[in-house]
Design a protein with these regions (language model features):
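Short, aromatic-rich membrane-interface segments at the entry and exit
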Residues: 27-37, 83-91, 136-144, 167, ...
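Juxtamembrane membrane-interface segments at transmembrane alpha-helix termini
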Residues: 46-54, 100-109, 129-131, 152-164, ...
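Cytoplasm-facing juxtamembrane segments at the starts of transmembrane helices
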Residues: 2-10, 56-65, 105-125, 141-145, ...
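N-terminal topogenic module of multi-pass integral membrane proteins
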Residues: 1-105, 217-248
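Hydrophobic alpha-helical transmembrane segments in multi-pass integral membrane proteins
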Residues: 75-81, 125-137, 180-195, 235-248
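Membrane-helix boundary elements
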Residues: 14-22, 62-73, 124-135, 145-164, ...
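Hydrophobic alpha-helical membrane segments
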Residues: 176-179, 196-211
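Internal transmembrane alpha-helix with an interfacial aromatic "cap," most often the third helix
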Residues: 74-81, 86-134, 154-158
Length: 248
């Protein structure tokens, strides 16, 4: 398949995300229509990407699963946004992001993997913390979702690391277990779910990036310092810019 055709399909996929969500979420989300429509859309994207990767002989399951995870997390994040204007802006921002990730499906660039991991992880954590606040399901459900989601996400991000699969799975499950324990611990704090998600994201980001460089044998003291400072600055900026409060 030519790259030009793939770019056109990528644009269609990005636009369809906006159209489907907007169609069934105006003026308010109609879950019984929106969720099934999105799942059909997600299945279609997954099938197309599988076909594209196989056709170009670059099929890899963990490379393939990244975009569906991003779309699913991004879709969940839409429900957490409180106002209609913010949702509209969110959908507009989604267009170039989805097009970018879809057009580069199968790309092995390290920076692409970093960006995709960070956006997916942030959206996923905010979604899980938000849903645990608004939908009072048994706590074990959210713990299982957190463990599985983080483990699979980390495992997909480590696919290009030149080590055995067992090493990658060990790293992924270790971070998944840590994220699950952290999710359970911070849930007792009387803070807004966005604050809890930001706090968890920053800790998970630092551990993941250090683990990533450690597996590549490129971890240095300067890198550790840099990412610690970066995570701290990011936390300060997000805490200042995010409307969070102590919950009664």
């Amino acid at each position: 398949m030519s790259n030009k055709i793939h770019l056109i399909v990528s644009a269609v996929i990005a636009i369809l995300f906006l159209v489907i969500v907007q169609l069934f979420a105006t003026p308010l989300p109609v879950f019984r229509f929106l969720v099934p429509a999105f799942l059909v859309y997600l299945a279609g994207v997954a099938l197309y990407n599988r076909f594209y990767l196989l056709r170009n002989e670059i099929w890899n399951f963990w490379m393939w699963v990244r975009l569906p995870m991003f779309l699913f997390s991004w879709f969940g994040l839409f429900f957490i946004i409180p106002s209609g204007l913010a949702r509209g802006m969110f959908l507009l921002v989604s267009l170039p992001i989805i097009f970018f990730f879809e057009s580069l499906i199968g790309n092995t660039g390290q920076q692409l993997g970093f960006n995709e991991f960070l956006l997916t992880c942030a959206a996923m954590l905010i979604t899980l913390f938000g849903f645990s606040y608004y939908f009072l399901l048994p706590g074990v459900v959210y713990l299982i979702l957190m463990f599985v989601s983080v483990s699979v996400l980390v495992r997909s991000s480590l696919e290009l690391v030149p080590l055995d699969s067992l090493v990658k799975w060990t790293a992924a499950m270790a971070l998944g277990l840590f994220a699950t324990e952290l999710f359970w611990t911070v849930s007792f704090l009387p803070l807004h779910y966005t604050a809890l998600a930001i706090f968890t994201f920053n800790i998970l980001y630092v551990l993941w990036v250090m683990y990533y460089h450690y597996l590549y044998k490129t971890l240095t003291a300067r890198q550790v310092q840099f990412h610690l400072v970066l995570a701290f600055v990011l936390a300060v900026i997000m805490f200042i810019s995010t409307p969070w409060s102590i919950q009664s």
